[in-house]
């Protein structure tokens, strides 16, 4: 099983690397190299797969967001944004992946599962993560306007939140951000 506990050695400016498990553990996707340069490490396979799902969403005219659910080191579900295709405003990548994983496991609780997603989840998706009991959330790009993990509603920080996954941010951030920027640039 992939774990970032010993990998994340760099902190984002002004933010601690590791805080309370309910808070975000920030990773930049790079580690200090020689002569002060930053050396990138390869993307973890689940995030690379989530980025592939995001590219598929973009090719289908959807906002390029992809998600992957892993249990015991194996991918059990993938999802990508599909609100337009499904005529369903709830068809976000995370929700699509959670639905597939729950059906695959024949259980609404996804205990021990990891969710890898290319963008910080919105309030709806963060709520679904809570209800599904996802153990760990890894996301690439922050979403200051619509995110609800480290921005906005901060769902996992609310006293009413009954389950708080471990959260890791910034893994594949550059790739996910560029994919989103390119998609919206082409739309303008």
Question: Where do the PLM segments sit?
Answer:
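Immediate flanking context of iron-sulfur cluster ligation sites
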Residues: 107-119
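Short beta->alpha transition motifs characteristic of CBS
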Residues: 76-83
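Charged/polar low-complexity intrinsically disordered segments
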Residues: 2-5, 13, 23
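Short beta-strand scaffold segments in enzyme catalytic cores
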Residues: 65-73
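Zinc-dependent deaminase
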Residues: 23-60, 108, 121-188
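A cytosolic small-molecule/anion-sensing beta-strand core signal
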Residues: 71-72, 99, 111
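Short hydrophobic alpha-helical segments enriched in small aliphatic residues
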Residues: 7-9, 21, 28
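A short, polar/charged loop-to-alpha-helix boundary motif
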Residues: 85-95
């Amino acid at each position: 099983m992939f774990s970032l506990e010993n990998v994340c050695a760099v902190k984002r400016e002004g933010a601690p690397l590791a805080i309370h498990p309910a808070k975000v553990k920030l990773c930049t996707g790079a580690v200090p190299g020689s002569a002060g340069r930053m050396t990138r490490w390869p993307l973890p396979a689940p995030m690379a797969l989530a980025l592939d799902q995001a590219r598929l969403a973009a090719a289908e005219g959807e906002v390029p967001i992809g998600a992957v659910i892993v249990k015991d080191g194996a991918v059990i579900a993938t999802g990508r944004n599909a609100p337009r295709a499904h005529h369903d405003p709830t068809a976000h990548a995370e929700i699509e992946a959670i639905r597939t994983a729950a059906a695959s496991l024949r259980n609404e609780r996804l205990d021990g599962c990891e969710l890898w997603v290319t963008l910080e989840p919105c309030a709806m998706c963060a709520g679904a993560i809570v209800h599904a009991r996802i153990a760990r959330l890894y996301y690439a790009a922050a979403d200051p306007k619509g995110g609800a993990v480290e921005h906005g509603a901060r769902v996992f920080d609310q006293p009413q939140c009954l389950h708080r996954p471990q959260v890791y941010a910034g893994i594949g951030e550059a790739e996910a951000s560029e994919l989103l920027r390119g998609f919206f640039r082409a739309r303008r």
